[in-house]
């Protein structure tokens, strides 16, 4: 929500949805701690009625978060339509947060919790089939989400910190750029809008004295950045982003995730993500955050 919208008294509604086992309950708990009025598992058909309550000006409903999942499959089909209708109103600002995780991670979480998947409560099918069906059903709502968060590699504390960063930052209403480094060997960054592969650059892994360090350490950072190939790539990348980013903002996107990947996610991608975040902070007035997903995984880059 922008400052102008707050001044005009518009209410804020956040719909939290996504894969079962991806962390919706934890997000709702975090939002409740931050002062949101939270509702868990509201049927989508009741969403317009709840918005009408918000529009009546009740102070306790100024900031609302509603978790909606796929338990009622038939009811869920109307969610995108209901969201479109609410977005056309001028008294409520609606955002959608979509949580997801890799299938193997969701399976692991369900085994730990010993709970049944909502699409497999009778145990009549395999868990992986239920997860795949859910992912297919959720593809449409994912496509309209303002925020897509992959929780595969996030610990509960890290997920809470990310939610806090979104909603406790006084500049939250501005366009946000998240720059992330990752290692392809650990899987691509699932929530990325733009992915850049820097595995063509000289690799510090093969310099024995640099191998134990990461791209945030000065010797590795300087090694990665000193090459002509790196400078040419960085110049071309920033030229492209200077052209693209304002366009994303103009089209109404509130968050852009830029992922930079190398083999292990410890050296080249970390150095480039660090430099890119610094550069974007210098030339734009947007919120720019940087995260190094795999930087502290035991070194094994090739």
Curated annotation (Swiss-Prot):
* Record-level Gene Ontology MF annotations: ATP binding; GTP binding
Gene3D superfamilies under this entry?
Answer: P-loop containing nucleotide triphosphate hydrolases (3.40.50.300)
- InterPro entries, sorted: P-loop_NTPase (IPR027417), RapZ-like (IPR005337), RapZ-like_N (IPR053930), RapZ_C (IPR053931)
- Amino-acid positions noted as binding ATP in the UniProt annotation, renumbered to this chain: 18-25
Q: Where does GTP bind?
A: 69-72
Instruction: State if ATP-binding is listed as a keyword.
Output: yes
Q: Does the keyword GTP-binding apply?
A: yes
Q: Which Pfam families does the record cross-reference, listed alphabetically?
A: PapZ_C, RapZ-like_N
Keyword terms of this UniProt record: ATP-binding, GTP-binding, Nucleotide-binding
PANTHER family assigned to the protein according to its UniProt record, in alphabetical order? RNASE ADAPTER PROTEIN RAPZ
Function text: Displays ATPase and GTPase activities.
Q: Which family does it belong to?
A: Belongs to the RapZ-like family.
> What is the designated name of this protein?
Nucleotide-binding protein SERP0433
